[in-house]
Amino acid sequence: MTNTRKTHPLIKIINHSFIDLPAPSNISAWWNFGSLLGLCLAIQILTGLFLAMHYTPDTMTAFSSVTHICRDVNYGWLIRYMHANGASMFFICLFLHVGRGMYYGSYTYFETWNIGVILLFAIMATAFMGYVLPWGQMSFWGATVITNLLSAIPYIGTTLVEWIWGGFSVDKATLTRFFAFHFILPFIIAALVMVHLLFLHETGSNNPSGLVSDSDKIPFHPYYTIKDALGILFLITALMTLVLFSPDLLGDPDNYTPANPLSTPPHIKPEWYFLFAYAILRSIPNKLGGVLALVFSILILTLFPLLHLSKQRSMMFRPLSQCIFWILVADLFTLTWIGGQPVEYPFITIGQLASVLYFSIILLILPAASLIENKLLKW
């Protein structure tokens, strides 16, 4: 008798993806973040759906509808804070997932990596538009500042900004379309995740050694299903601790003030997960230059497969590259800190140095270290 799991047209897709999938026997906890990101996406779509049932995308009522969710809807406060802090957990997992790919050379799976970069852009766009929806001070001014950056594009810039705004300033039309995009994008992201997995399953997973693991594979279930379950337990514990004990830890107090176009907050800054890119944007005195640096700070990830000059795939056996990688991580922490500081001395200088170091490490120092390590292999 044939097993339904292996013959049913739909169930066999799940079987080949999560049950009988051959996986390397030595993948570490760094490979848990894919499933955690899937969980984060599911949490965000689910909590977002329930929030959308009570939210009104109108400048007059948006702020009070969020207040209504927190005060009057059954467990509305829980749903709202799970959604807000779920975004933070999403980005923590994202950064760790991308960092893992950089460290272990997973970017040599060209299609999987590039779909991943597109996913990163889509998630950043979704998070930005979601931040605008509560219509607090930081929502309004964040939307104004970031959309205004497009005016730096020569010739069509101003027209483009007014087209996105749906008027001459961020107003009702902007809020309505941002809500529409914020609702539809997660489903597009879910579809892209399927493509991401499709390309990954064409090649199979990478592993910490960076070596071909075809001779030593184990089934995904039960080994990695139980391992993922442990990761999920940790993630939910962290998320619920944040939600139930300090839900506003990562938010901005200014967003508890309703949006007022006549009063600019003293320090306009995005959510913490955008601060590194915001610091790079601010470190260049020219508007167009800043916008290009901002876009390129993420787009540079697509160059990783081209900049890989080492004879070894993973950094596991490359101490020089390891050192430089961790300097890059420290640099990103520095940029995140600077992004939240006011634009004054010494923060401007620190931000500029950190920005130069960020691009230098990726474009020059890491490839140079790879060449040195190649030479050392011959000695």
Swiss-Prot record:
Cofactor(s) needed for function: heme b
Entry annotated with the keyword Metal-binding: yes
GO cellular component: mitochondrial inner membrane; respiratory chain complex III
Name assigned to this protein: Cytochrome b
Pfam family, one: Cytochrome_B
Protein's GO biological process: mitochondrial electron transport, ubiquinol to cytochrome c
Membrane topology summary: Multi-pass membrane protein
Organism of derivation: Xerospermophilus tereticaudus (Round-tailed ground squirrel)
Binding, a ubiquinone: H201
Positions annotated to bind heme b b566: H97, H196
Record family assignment: Belongs to the cytochrome b family.
Chain positions recorded as heme b b562 binding sites: H83, H182
Subunit structure: The cytochrome bc1 complex contains 11 subunits: 3 respiratory subunits (MT-CYB, CYC1 and UQCRFS1), 2 core proteins (UQCRC1 and UQCRC2) and 6 low-molecular weight proteins (UQCRH/QCR6, UQCRB/QCR7, UQCRQ/QCR8, UQCR10/QCR9, UQCR11/QCR10 and a cleavage product of UQCRFS1). This cytochrome bc1 complex then forms a dimer.
